[in-house]
Structure formats: C-alpha cells, structure tokens
Amino acid sequence: YNVNLNLNDEAIYGEATSSSFDNKKIKRQNSASPRYMSDTPMEQTRANLPHWSQGETCIFVTFRLADSIPKEKRIQWGAERDEWMDKHPQPWDENTSIEYNERFGGKLEQWLDDGFGSCVLKDSCCREIIERALSYFDGQRYVLYAFVVMPNHVHVLFAPLAPHTMSTIIQSWKSFTARIMRKRIGGIGPFWQKESWDRLIRSESHFRYVANYIRNNPRKSNIPVYASETCAKICNWDDSMEKRLK
C-alpha cells in the first residue's frame, strides 16, 4: 500500500503549519487540567453507548473495525448491558460508572483480542496510516500519551486541548483514516464501528494502569504473529501528566 499521505489535502483534518509541530510546548489556561476533578461536573452524551468527558481530562478510548466482533456476541453483550442498565438508571455516580466499564468494557476487549474479522490493521502499511493520523495534531488539538494499533482495534490515551473536544477528535481520526483506508485497500460499507468505548482517567494510578495496558496489549493478543511485532507507541508513559505538560 502507498502511505505517502498528504494530510493537509483532507478537509476533515483542516490546515496545520509545520512550525506548529516544531514547538512542543503546550499552552493551557490556568483553569485547564488533564486530571479528573471529582468536584467538576462531567459531560455525558448517549447514543448506543454512554460517553463521558470533562474538559481537558485524560481519556482512554478504544475504537474498532466494523467486523471485529461476531454478530451473536454483539447481541449477547447488548442484551446483558441493557438488562444491567435497566437496573441502574442514569445519571450514574462514579462507582456505578466504574462498575459499568469493568463489567462490559473488559468483555469487549477480550473479544477484540481474540482477533475476529478481517484484522486489516495487522498490515504494517495500514498501521502506519493510523499511527500518522493519531500523531498529526499531537500538541495542537490534543496531548497524545500512548496508543497501540492492534489487528482489529486501536487504543488511545490522550487529553483534548480546548476548544477541541473528545467527540470531535475521535470522529476526525475515524473519518479521515476510514477514507484513506478505503482508497488503499478497497471494500464497501463502514470501516470503523460507529461508536467508541471511552473512560475518563481518574487518578495517576489509573493513568499508569492504562499506559501499561496499552504497552502490554500486543503480548496478550491471541494472534502470535502480530503479537511478536512492536506496535505500541508510548509517549513518556512513565512520567506524570504534569511533567509531560510543563
């Protein structure tokens, strides 16, 4: 595949000058913080999945290929989730949100690691398309802490930079890469599953846990050929968020 991407030609990514990427200093308003604030309201949106955001707080997001989970498992998962949600009406407190993520997020991630579907992202050229798109606006629209491109899904740990929001950033990644991938490999129909799975980072220990999860995810995959390759990109994963943002 040809991965000589001209990102500025894509309207979804807008315009960016090279000088903006030479300057790695990230300017924030005094009130902005990448840390979760327990006394600050969260913004919640809902489609098929609930989504939470809180300004520039760090987020762990997973988005997957449209064919990455078998239909029967999606139906099973959806039925179990709907039953649980009927017993836990929203809005949720912090503990209920954590329970939701542990109960249903863990199951999805295990199925993804089973390697179902076309798994086109195990091709090195396809991975490069995703990696370059994720890195392109690092420091301008978001701070990219860590990511890994797995055969059928992508994990990203990042913090939005105002005025950009979690939802618009994720949508731009998915829209742009879907368009490029369809040009490169063909095919019809959705490339990515419409919705993503996201979790707010609530503490530094949570941040470290997620960074390590991303780092180790290739080794835990049930696809030995791919798991042996180096595909995790960790940006200062052993530093605190404050140190990265100085």
Which sequence ranges carry the predicted segments?
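Short catalytic/metal-binding and nucleic-acid-binding patches
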Residues: Y1-K246
